[in-house]
Amino acid sequence: MAKEASGNVYFDVYANEESLGRIVMKLEDDIVPKTAKNFRTLCERPKGEGYKGSTFHRIIPGFMVQGGDYTAHNGTGGRSIYGEKFPDENFELKHTKEGILSMANCGAHTNGSQFFITLGKTQWLDEKHVVFGEVVEGMDVVHKIAKYGSESGQVKKGYRIEIRDCGVLGSN
């Protein structure tokens, strides 16, 4: 397990053809190993099979940015490495600040590939969404992404906020 669980992951994010920068995230392998492995693996897969080329499809300024639907690209799809969905691992970690990385779902035990990054403390999501990491570099990029959102969550017309590249940074 220790061999797999190494290195932070990154997203290189673009708004159409403009680079917004890189987000680097630390995953909590010791606390939520199955959830962290799912996310890390989807960061390593080629375009069409994971996060590379997928978008942030739901962006609510002051709340969160959501992505990870690499199958339908609109919030209705996505798939975990374990099959369609997998159970909530635990709720040990909490939504205590901006930059928290957590699983998006549509109810208990419906984790797939969709995730969100918080833009502030969102404690009402505790016990409902599995926290599995946090942003360690590039929170400014997350705030840039937020500028393309709306209260309804829709991305500003004419913009595609894409994870152009992603992967795992060197082993620790």
From Swiss-Prot:
EC number: 5.2.1.8
Keyword vocabulary terms for this entry: Cytoplasm, Isomerase, Rotamase
Database matches in Gene3D superfamilies: Cyclophilin-like
GO MF annotations, alphabetized: cyclosporin A binding; peptidyl-prolyl cis-trans isomerase activity
Record-annotated PPIase cyclophilin-type domain positions: 10-168
Enzyme class: isomerase
Keyword Ribonucleoprotein on entry: no
Name of the protein described by the UniProt record: Peptidyl-prolyl cis-trans isomerase
Designated gene of the protein: CPR1
